[in-house]
Amino acid sequence: MLIIPAIDLKDGHCVRLEQGEMDKATVFSEDPAAMARRWKEHGARRLHLVDLNGAFAGKPVNDAAIQAIVEAVGDEMPVQLGGGIRDLATIERYLDDGVRYVIIGTAAVKNPGFLHEACDAFPGHVMVGLDARDGKVAVEGWSKLTGHDVVDLAKRFEGYGVEAVIYTDIGRDGMLTGVNIDATQRLAQALSIPVIASGGVTNLDDVRGLSAVAKDGIIGAITGRAIYQGTLDFAEAQKLADELAGGVFGV
């Protein structure tokens, strides 16, 4: 099971939000590329990037920072990127620039046909980001709540060729309150698509809890504020995940 450090980009800086609120942003670095190199040096095997401005604008915004990060980490640490990806041209450009996986969120919810088209055009490179509050999916930078049940919606994407579903519990994101293991496990059990947990991964207990259910289809856990504020030591977390859930799904 991979522990995946997150870099959220706002106005070119590395920030963390509380529950997706843009006006509750803490700046952790004004040099995101240097931060990415730091996580690579700590042994990270993948990096999670979010263009926060892009998520709200519905189009890419932090291109320069994204390009600098991809160049800084090279091919050895694959980058998965979400935020504002709404068309095939954007996906193609990001992949050409060295991003390994693109994450489609709002567009997948509003236009499943686009998701299917993207998976067909770029097999093995498309993930879905499903962000939920109390089990209901939110869109547009978490600013709008839909009536979609997260499990029901995810099951519709079976057979599309989605590489993974990134499941975020909005109520826990950036709050250091612990990951929602039960909801993540329920989603993983319902799907044949691998699941990556996000939101609230705070300490080694969360890593232990997710590792215990990794066999149900959880291949990774994204962590942000915890590794920046020190409640979770990244290297320790990955070592523990390797010991408890190493080799699950070959990651």
Curated annotation (Swiss-Prot):
Q: Name one GO biological process term.
A: L-histidine biosynthetic process
Family assignment? Answer: Belongs to the HisA/HisF family.
**Disulfide topology:** none
A GO molecular function assigned to this protein is: 1-(5-phosphoribosyl)-5-[(5-phosphoribosylamino)methylideneamino]imidazole-4-carboxamide isomerase activity
One Pfam match:
His_biosynth
What are the catalytic residues?
D8 (proton acceptor), D131 (proton donor)
Query: CDD domains recorded for this chain?
Result: HisA (cd04732)
Instruction: Report the top EC class in one word.
Output: isomerase
What's a single GO CC term here?
Answer: cytoplasm
Question: Which pathway is this protein engaged in?
Answer: Amino-acid biosynthesis; L-histidine biosynthesis; L-histidine from 5-phospho-alpha-D-ribose 1-diphosphate: step 4/9
EC id:
5.3.1.16
Keywords in alphabetical order:
Amino-acid biosynthesis, Cytoplasm, Histidine biosynthesis, Isomerase
- Specify the superkingdom: Bacteria
Which locations, inside or outside the cell, does it occupy? Cytoplasm
Which reaction(s) does its UniProt entry say it catalyses? 1-(5-phospho-beta-D-ribosyl)-5-[(5-phospho-beta-D-ribosylamino)methylideneamino]imidazole-4-carboxamide = 5-[(5-phospho-1-deoxy-D-ribulos-1-ylimino)methylamino]-1-(5-phospho-beta-D-ribosyl)imidazole-4-carboxamide
Name this protein carries in UniProt: 1-(5-phosphoribosyl)-5-[(5-phosphoribosylamino)methylideneamino] imidazole-4-carboxamide isomerase
| The species this protein was found in | Thiobacillus denitrificans (strain ATCC 25259 / T1)
